[in-house]
Amino acid sequence: MMIENQYSLAPALNVDLRKFQRTALIVGMIGVIALIIGFFTTTAEQFLRSYLVGFFFWNGMALGCFVLVMIQYMTGGAWGMIIRRPLEAGTRTWTLCALLVLPILIGVHSLYAWAQPAVVAHDKVLQDKQYYLNVPFFWIRAVLYYAIWGTIITLLNRWSLEQDRTGDLKLAKKLETLSGPGIVIYTFTMTFAATDWIMSLEPHWFSTIYGFIICVGQALSGLSLIVALLVFLGHFQPLSGIVTKRHLNDLGKLLLALVMLWAYLSFSQLILIWSGNLPEEITWYTARLNGGWQYVGAILLIFHFGFPFLLLLSQALKKNPKTIQRIAIYIIVVRIIDVFWLIEPSLHPAHFQLHWLDVVAPIGIGGLWLSHFFYNLQQRPILPPNAPDLEKALNHGRHQH
């Protein structure tokens, strides 16, 4: 028990986290009230599109934490040991995300053309896709996604907590053994979920790379949140004497790798579709490269890839706590813009339009999510006291200047 206390949150930090939790909850409740007002004052389709932007981003934040913690369990890297507990806290928000998906499931007829019989009756392509794109199967798949994610997340968190209590080395092996197939299962199920919730907004369109782009974006979102949080946690015990510049440099390298991978996959998708020039594929880009939406695309090219790429090349910037924290927060903002760009042009293909709900929904849902996240973070020691590689992680970069 003394080992566990050694890595418990400092009292001052607990006070701050409770403040963050309460503040986030207040923001979330104000956001919910604003969403209710929006529900009664705008069209069902606009409300649900805006809600989908907020839901999909924060659901992706939870799943980004999920895949990152599995990578950490598998590799045992020092970079991940000090962020394991925040990542685990992020994964346990899956229960909230399972509730937040309900408006999408309930509003399916207003949100998706393939769920509207009058539209399907005059569309041969949608008729051919009805075996997959039908409402009962859509609901069943959503339940399956959360059942699968929830089961793996519950097992990982249970074994991690049990390892804290017992120090049983077999549990580390169990975490590693489940995480391997878990990463594959996550990628597979998230590809289908992205197809269901986002790609099917434009049901004639398809892309085989799309699911991978979504998965990488989620990992980038999750890591950005955790890096921003880690710098804050590093001001308090027990992490104030543990987090080194080398830890931050390693996490900065991982951020850079994910930024580059997102850009590579996005560019690959564009080149493949543009060179193929097939009517059912090219329409997705013609909607996003015209009517003002091209400026959002340019913003993503410059600020989602170019700017963070240049910043993260610098080792000095990666090792500077304040700078890497600002970069991480900045990436979170452009990640929301990316999700907005994926969803909204399907509703307004002719011209750019930003509805006030497009701003309110991510903030409101984010308040609820962050409140749950900060609550989870307070429930366990900030470091896993009996993890096999903990000592190596604590000494990572300790003697470097």
What are these regions (language model features)?
Residues L48-F55, I83-R85, E202-C215, T286, ...:
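Non-cytosolic membrane-interface motifs at loop->transmembrane helix junctions
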Residues A62-M70, L99-P103, A142-T154, V216-V231, ...:
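Hydrophobic cores of alpha-helical transmembrane segments in multi-pass inner/ER membrane proteins
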Residues V15-L35, K129-L300, L317, A387-L390:
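Long, contiguous internal "core" modules enriched in hydrophobic/ aromatic residues
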Residues T91-V108, A257-S266, I327-I331:
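Hydrophobic alpha-helical membrane-insertion segments
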Residues F55-R165, S179-G182:
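Transmembrane-helix bundle segments that line or gate the permeation/cavity pathway
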Residues G38-E45, D196-P203, F340-H348:
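Juxtamembrane "helix-exit" motif on the non-cytosolic side of transmembrane helices
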Residues F20, A118-D123, F303-P308, L312-H401:
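TerminUS-proximal long segments
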Residues M2-A62, Q130, K392-H401:
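N-terminal regions that are enriched for targeting/export leaders
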